[in-house]
Structures are given as C-alpha cells and as structure tokens.
Amino acid sequence: QADLSDLKRLLDTMEIDEYFKEFLGLCRERGHRVYVLSDGYDLCIEAVFEKYHINVPYYANRMIYDGSFKIECPGTNPACGICGTCKTRLMEELKGEGNTVVYIGDGYSDTCPATRADVVFAKKDLYRFCRDNGVSARYFTDFKEIIIYLKSLQ
C-alpha cells in the first residue's frame, strides 16, 4: 500500500511540456487568463506546479491523505456525474462576457468542453473524439504550436 511519500516520489518524476512555461509567459504578457481544469487531483497538480514554479489557478478533485487516501469531487455536476470535475461548467463560468475560449486538452474528460469552446487544441483521445464527432479541433504535439497560433493573432 502506497503512502504520501510514495506518491510524492512518483510525482517528482513527472515532467511538463517543455514549452508550457513559455506559453504561460506569452499569455501573461498579452493579458490572456489561463486556468487549469483537471479531472485529476489537487495534490498531484500542486506537486508539479511547485516543482516547476508555476502559479496558475486550477480546479481539480481533492486528494486527502490522513493515513489513507480519500477523494472529494467538489466540482462534479450532479445532473451528469460522468466526471469528478465538470470542466464545461467551469469553462462557462470563467469565460466572461465577450471572451474567446482557447481550450487545450487530450483526454476523455475534455470531450464535453471541447464541443463548446471557441478554439480547440487537441491530441490523443480528445483529438480522436473531435475527429470522429465533427468537432473542429487543431491537432497539437506540444505547446510550441499553440504559442505560434497565439502569436499569429496579433
């Protein structure tokens, strides 16, 4: 059975996209708001953010350790219940009036918000979903491609 120190050792091996911090810098420079909407766990996100000195608001499920791991899903949508964090509801709440949503994702929990975002960058399972369901999406391999797109806007 794993404990908190085992999890932290595992999380310390995780890496982020090599262009992610450059992407964040460009967004800050241009006044674009960035949020991480995750169906993962706060404990994991915090560990990765701390390792890479990232300060971005995020929404995720809660992982609580008090001798054993417990999960809380404060962002679930009771009417749906598919994901622990309803990214679509959060995206709509955070969008604000007249703003364009550029949604970046790769997994199953990104499928619903991808159908409602203005611009979608997708890879892996999300790209397959978009392709198979007629959702307009730009395939990406890394954040460098998203940086190029953002720079082309101005």
Predicted segments with their positions:
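Metal-dependent phosphoesterase signature
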Residues: 1-22, 30-32
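C-terminal cap/substrate-recognition subdomain and adjoining C-terminal extension
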Residues: 18-35, 40-154
